[in-house]
Amino acid sequence: MTEIVEIFTDGACRGNPGPGGWGALLCYQGREKTLSGAESKTTNNRMELMAAIRALETLKRPCRVHLTTDSQYLRQGITCWLSNWKRRGWKTANRQPVKNIDLWQRLDQVAAQHRIEWFWVRGHEGHPGNERADALARSAITNGEEK
């Protein structure tokens, strides 16, 4: 587990809820792989989660990963909130059910297979990996398919 897989993810939605898409760019040893998908009625947060989940599910073995997102919801959720949610039986600090629990549980399971560092960048600020993931997510909404 010495080589690092760089992953850039983004989610997009036209309306919230509305048609949504997600995109991911994976970079490893000079090679790139792009992934994207869409749902007809979803939220931006669900698309952010799906981008990370599908990117991590694509990895064929345990890896060191640097995952970069422009979603504070995703980064804060996985690095800060998740352990508390699990300890409380998947309830928030206000004792409410965690939103998007199906995706958080799926992300928790797939993330446990890897050694991941989570990074946040401000969206639409010209970060090349984030811009490509954003373009994939927006294109997926228009094309409505998984690639």
Curated annotation (Swiss-Prot):
InterPro entries: RNase_H (IPR050092), RNaseH-like_sf (IPR012337), RNaseH_domain (IPR002156), RNaseH_sf (IPR036397), RNaseHI (IPR022892). Mg(2+) 2 binds at residues 10, 134. GO terms for cellular component: cytoplasm. Its main location: cytoplasm. Residues 1-142 form the RNase H type-1 domain. Keywords: Cytoplasm, Endonuclease, Hydrolase, Magnesium, Metal-binding, Nuclease. It is an enzyme of class 3 (hydrolase). Its EC number is 3.1.26.4. Transmembrane segments: none annotated. It is found in: Cytoplasm. PROSITE patterns: RNASE_H_1. Mg(2+) 1 binds at residues 10, 48, 70. Monomer. HAMAP family: RNase_H (MF_00042). Belongs to the RNase H family. This is Ribonuclease H. It comes from Nitrosococcus oceani (strain ATCC 19707 / BCRC 17464 / JCM 30415 / NCIMB 11848 / C-107).
